[in-house]
A protein has these predicted regions:
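Bacterial N-terminal signal peptides
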Residues: 11-18
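Eukaryotic scaffold repeat domains enriched in small/polar residues
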Residues: 22-389
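Bacterial N-terminal signal peptides that target proteins for export
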Residues: 2-10
């Protein structure tokens, strides 16, 4: 998958989100961190990788709807979610939430556009909140709307307050409240304490000269019971524990191919940063676009040699794979993780790029054919039965 043109604007614009060392109570020592040392050139020149080498099962579900839904696989996975029974897709333009059952059958749609209770004119993410059993929608002005699962009946609005916190661009529910990401402040990661109803910074900062950020797929991912965040220029991961202590949890070591913060110049525009990224990626793993963890297996999308590559690393066996595309000719792009599966929402006209009927069972092949013939969107579900060791 070449990273250029329109795909570049959507996939790479913001892969320089770089969380620099924090202050205060944070512990930035790497002694207890997982260190993953990889020779990317040897991995790419080694044996080809089959999608069956990674997942036990791949399923496809056609979303049975005649409505045109504005969404793209390249805009990330913040506009759809799953609660174990139903899919929810937030239309990025109409602010309508479409509900489908787990088999793709259309249930109903609910327009949320407006200025009344439970309505909004801006939204950057939809998310299932397992602790509250609600569907949460983030308005970047600092509001989170709670809706009942399935019916989407409005429940309440959380108005998040915090000193200097004026905009929120990503969030993830936690047992104590929410972790928040803001791209307009030096302090990027905040914790909202539901009990005290206040947001406080976690001590993760972005270097001032990198304040010109680009679009990133996601700022958070879960590993077991913990929530992780990462800095995109080198993939270093940080664990945010229940006491708000921030510790380095994982370090990627690509040797001479590792990106270095000191090599990234101060540039005046995103366009110039894009040009630098492409040039830098000729000899370095220049950026991490996304990281996900499924059943002790890390899946990371990285920019190397001007393309989006995928790294699959099993934390139990310490075995690694890296590829541009699988031997079936398929890219593997990070999606929404639920239990031991990863889900990717794909437009019908892009299905041939992301999935092949050769890797699907008979039921999924019929769903694929229905999606392509009707122009419907589809959900690709990878590894619902678990990830291979």
């Amino acid at each position: 998958m070449a990273v250029n043109g329109k795909k570049t604007a959507l996939l790479v614009f913001a892969t320089l989100i770089a969380f620099a060392a924090g202050c205060g109570k944070s512990d930035w020592k790497d002694s207890s961190a997982i260190r993953i040392k990889l020779d990317v050139d040897s991995l790419l020149n080694g044996m080809s990788v089959s999608i069956d080498d990674i997942f036990q099962e791949i399923q496809l579900v056609c979303l049975d709807s005649s409505d045109m839904i504005s969404n793209s696989v390249y805009s990330g996975h913040n506009h759809y979610t799953f609660d174990g029974e139903y899919f929810y897709v937030l239309d990025e333009k109409s602010f309508t939430i479409h509900v489908f059952d787990s088999h793709g059958k259309f249930v109903h749609s609910s327009s949320k556009k407006g200025r009344g209770p439970g309505e909004f004119t801006m939204a950057t993410k939809i998310c299932y909140n397992a602790d509250l059993n609600t569907i949460d929608v983030l308005n970047p002005i600092g509001k989170i709307y709670h809706f009942r699962t399935k019916t989407l009946e409005y429940v309440s609005t959380l108005d998040i307050k915090g000193k200097d916190l004026q905009a929120i661009h990503d969030f993830v529910p936690t047992r104590s409240g929410y972790l928040l990401y803001s791209n307009t402040l030096d302090e990027r990661i905040w914790h909202y304490d539901s009990e005290n109803r206040i947001a406080n910074p976690c001590g993760i900062r972005l270097p001032e000269y990198l304040s010109i950020y680009f679009y990133a797929q996601d700022r958070f991912y879960s590993m077991g019971e913990s929530v992780q965040t990462f800095r995109a220029f080198d993939g270093k991961c940080f664990n945010l524990d229940s006491s708000l202590n921030v510790r380095t949890s994982l370090v990627w070591d690509f040797g001479k191919r590792s990106a270095q913060l000191k090599a990234i110049p101060e540039l005046p525009s995103a366009r110039e940063y894009h040009g630098f990224l492409m040039d830098y990626s000729d000899n370095h793993v220049a950026a991490f676009n996304d990281i996900k963890c499924i059943d002790r297996t890390l899946i990371a999308n990285v920019i190397y040699k001007r393309n989006l590559h995928t790294i699959v690393y099993n934390l139990a066996s310490n075995q690694a794979k890296m590829f541009l595309k699988t031997e079936e000719g398929l890219p593997l792009v990070c999606g929404l993780v639920y239990d031991n599966s990863m889900m990717l929402l794909v437009d019908s006209h892009m299905l041939p790029e992301f999935i092949s009927t050769e890797v699907l069972d008979e039921v999924s092949v019929r769903e694929y054919q229905k999606a392509t013939s009707t122009g419907s969107m589809a959900i690709i579900r990878y590894g619902r039965s678990g990830v291979k060791p």
